Design a protein with these regions (language model features):
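Alpha-helical propensity feature that highlights long, continuous alpha-helices across diverse contexts
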Residues: 2-175
Length: 175
């Protein structure tokens, strides 16, 4: 005669995680940080924002970016400008720029327009264009890793637990 065996599991939800910091840290580490499948869900939109922005400014984009909180040696963003364009051209290109609607688009537009208002970028000779482009590259790099850093933060983890109503086993797996 077959037997039925049942096992009870203790399940933890958001309220449990908020009450027990040690439990929260353990599950956060196992489920969020250590999972090789956990990457920033917005990374594709971020890359699309960079591509659309570069395309709008008639620049070529080359990049290698990790999906981690911090860059490694192989990470870079490289923009290659059209040196025939000047300050007025770039401002005109950005005038009605919306990008793909993601926040990086507006951040890059605002940052670049502020750069173009600076004295050193009023006239874009080759060296000034190189400096101008370098500042945009650095901004893209900073936006990428700031977004990843936030995504992997404990605060972001707790927000995901709340909006998805996740419940966990003590070993850090979803219940």
């Amino acid at each position: 005669m077959p037997k039925t065996i049942t096992k009870e599991y203790v399940v933890y939800d958001l309220e449990d995680l908020k009450k027990d910091n040690e439990l929260c840290d353990r599950i956060y580490q196992k489920f969020w940080i250590d999972s090789p499948d956990n990457i920033n869900g917005w990374s594709d939109e971020n890359i699309d924002s960079f591509k659309k922005f570069a395309e709008t400014l008639n620049m070529s984009l080359d990049f290698s970016l990790s999906n981690a909180e911090y860059q490694d040696r192989g990470c870079y963003v490289k923009l290659i400008p059209d040196y025939r364009l000047d300050n007025k051209d770039y401002k005109e290109m950005l005038k009605d720029y919306k990008g793909n609607g993601y926040c990086f688009c507006d951040d890059l537009k605002t940052f670049t327009l502020k750069l173009l208002d600076k004295k050193e970028y009023k006239v874009l000779c080759e060296w000034a264009t190189n400096d101008f482009v370098l500042e945009i590259q650095n901004k893209m790099f900073q936006l990428w890793f700031t977004d990843n850093e936030y995504y992997f933060s404990k605060q972001s983890f707790l927000e995901m637990v709340e909006c998805n109503e996740y419940e966990f086993l003590e070993n850090g797996r979803l219940a």
